Amino acid sequence: MVVERTLSIIKPDAVAKNVIGQIYARFEAAGLKVVAARMAHLSRVEAENFYAIHRERPFFKDLVEFMISGPVMIQVLEGENAIAKNRELMGATDPKKAEKGTIRADFAENIDANAVHGSDAPETAAVEIACFFPSLEVYSR
């Protein structure tokens, strides 16, 4: 099995619900280690740059507005198959379609306020991690 790193963001809705610790417990129970973390209130430019891949999509403006609506918790997770494992923990993008017991099924309101973001591939994980953390701030443990 391959040890990977993935970027995870606990979005403003979940931060406001005070469920950061419950989400971290799920990461750790699944064998994922937090190797970098910080809380931030994203600027409009940061959110637009982070989600630039969606710039032409109809939901882009609302996504950016949501992501700057309050603080987020940003972390790098490390572990065997971390990307797939985190995506399984998160559940489907639409919480109504997410399996029971996933983060989105348990903590998300709707497809827009869906509690968490996770990288979808090793290439995007590397780019997303670099967006928020210089390599000197990521510690294997």
UniProtKB/Swiss-Prot annotation:
Homotetramer. Belongs to the NDK family. Keywords: ATP-binding, Cytoplasm, Kinase, Magnesium, Metal-binding, Nucleotide metabolism, Nucleotide-binding, Phosphoprotein, Transferase. The gene is ndk. The active site is at 117 (pros-phosphohistidine intermediate). It comes from Nitrosomonas eutropha (strain DSM 101675 / C91 / Nm57). Its cofactor is Mg(2+). It is an enzyme of class 2 (transferase). Major role in the synthesis of nucleoside triphosphates other than ATP. The ATP gamma phosphate is transferred to the NDP beta phosphate via a ping-pong mechanism, using a phosphorylated active-site intermediate. This is Nucleoside diphosphate kinase. Gene3D superfamilies: Nucleoside diphosphate kinase-like domain.
